[in-house]
Amino acid sequence: MAREYKIEDYRNFGIMAHIDAGKTTMTERILFYTGKNHKIGETHDGASTMDWMEQEQERGITITSAATTTFWQGRDGKKRRFNIIDTPGHVDFTIEVERSLRVLDGAIALLDANAGVEPQTETVWRQAEKYHVPRMVFVNKMDKIGADFYRSVEMVGSRLGAVALPVQLPIGAENDFVGVVDLIEMKALTWDGTIGAPATVGEIPADMADKAEEYREKLIELAVEIDEAAMEAYLEGTMPTNDELRALIRKGTIEVKFHPILCGTAFKNRGVQPLLDAVVEFLPAPTDVPAIKGIDVKTETETTRESSDEAPLSMLAFKIMNDPFVGSLTFARIYSGKLTKGVSLENTVKGKRERIGRMLQMHSNSREDIDEAFAGDIVALAGLKETTTGDTLCDPLKPVILERMEFPDPVIEIAIEPKTKADQEKMGIALNRLAAEDPSFRVKSDEESGQTIIAGMGELHLDILVDRMKREFKVEANVGAPQVAYRESITRAAEIDYTHKKQSGGSGQFARVKIIFEPHDGDDFIFESKIVGGSVPKEYIPGVQKGIESVMGAGPLAGFPMLGVKATLIDGTYHDVDSSVLAFEIASRAAFREGAQKAGAQLLEPIMKVEVVTPEDYVGDVIGDLNSRRGQISGTEARGIATVVNAMVPLANMFGYVNSLRSMSQGRAQYTMQFDHYEPVPTAVAQEIQKKFA
């Protein structure tokens, strides 16, 4: 079977937004207008197509990014293939967003016309900047009370630091919003609100003619800056044609020089079709973005993989999901080459082979079996054994490791216990499955209490995982109170000279090490050997490193993992008969325990970046409350009629904050929080923690 659509006619994009900007409704409309959905699912009644896990439907927020393939006929009459990746908008799921942005070529940022740029919009926008993803902006909910298109455009500049390029203006607002002015064609597009109805094209309303002229002029001025020849022609008085203008906007968008801005209301079916045309006209095909970089496994040098069917096969696994009918599904983006069912591929990250059994094309929650797929495709693979998120699968003869994704460490932990003996076994399976799907979720067991501890990015994150355990795996569990993931570190250098000697019939054990332990700025552990003259033979040195690493998981104060330690082995002594790797391991273990005490061990706690958006009446209460939680206020700013309070607050003092904020502001204030850094715990608090955990 040959390729059906040319790679130039692909658009791999996602929709990114704040929690309530209407992303699910927008995705639904896109699926409806592109002909894949016959009945529109409304988020309000929990029947939406993309949000296919039960909790997403109940909570009305999108958690799992599902990939959907659909098609759209552009203005030029040519059909394009859209692969849409749904991304979550809640801060506890930023890992999902990061992961989907990694495999997109472009994105639509959705704004709520009333709220404009919200905290989570900024977070997601920053993540998209990191991967240099071309973006358009759609100002949604233009029918809402307080909708203000021009303020939203201004906020794209002031809050996101991005260059906004309106290509449409709204006709009317709130209840009177009827359509848009197309600034390229200089026509008015209006809709009567009937579902699926095309726009009526007419003349621009007389009272908007001047404004439209002014904005078109700004549009042209920004667009011609992208191209020298166009700029020269413009300065000499030659205006670009509409097609030339579209080509310039496309070039600038793909180069992330500016962001086209459109508007409408997905819920009332106004403005959706022009947005789909804009996806075709302004967002990149896989061949328009730089080729993906990777490391050639054989030569260990940097290499690239072009978006072409002729190039060696390479693909990136970006999501693992458990499908009730198919079992484990691995979603992967094919960057280069052609994939055929039944082939064996190399997982270069794990160094294992994987056989491709069943291959599926997903449409939100229905699926179609396929036998082959090509560069640019996003496919779901059933039954992979070794592959986890972020792994590369490729042609075994041309092995490559594509860029790795980096995932943050979890900041919150809870103890979890199965309710019955029967739940015990099921819980282990469920937790392993969930951890394979989500790299920001960790499972470990507490050696002393024997309890199972789960760790994640926030309270909502863990709530949802416990909920999934109950629903998908039928595991009933008791959940403890959330615990902070404290860490320990050292404050000064200490030199330790330690000898391990054991003599008990036959050969004994002997090792002497002299190690300097000192703090360093990073969070990782650094080991260095400065042994000269063979006082510790080369083959024993890894034992020294291993010994230290084995005890760094439990610091001397309260048994928390240690961060930011550098150990330098400077001297030692060995015995021809009694020394071994194990003896040096034991010696360095004891040396570290002694060193951590002498080097001024201290407790560290996670500090969260908190942003509260509140009506002005409650600002005093919000600030007072954050101060009482050991928070440091870093500033306040006006946002429309609301005030934004920014603060750094220890995570330990933020549990249950959502309820306090709700009652303090009569439900009118909102907040977002994300991990920022670790900081030493004040002495009085540290003593309490040590008492509790020692």
Swiss-Prot record:
Keywords per UniProt: Cytoplasm, Elongation factor, GTP-binding, Nucleotide-binding, Protein biosynthesis
Gene it is expressed from: fusA
Function statement: Catalyzes the GTP-dependent ribosomal translocation step during translation elongation. During this step, the ribosome changes from the pre-translocational (PRE) to the post-translocational (POST) state as the newly formed A-site-bound peptidyl-tRNA and P-site-bound deacylated tRNA move to the P and E sites, respectively. Catalyzes the coordinated movement of the two tRNA molecules, the mRNA and conformational changes in the ribosome.
Gene Ontology molecular functions: GTP binding; GTPase activity; guanosine tetraphosphate binding; translation elongation factor activity
Top-rank taxon, per record: Bacteria
GO CC, any one term: cytoplasm
One Gene Ontology biological process: ribosome disassembly
Keyword Glycosyltransferase included in the entry's annotation: no
Residue ranges constituting the tr-type G domain according to the UniProt record: 8-287
This protein's name: Elongation factor G
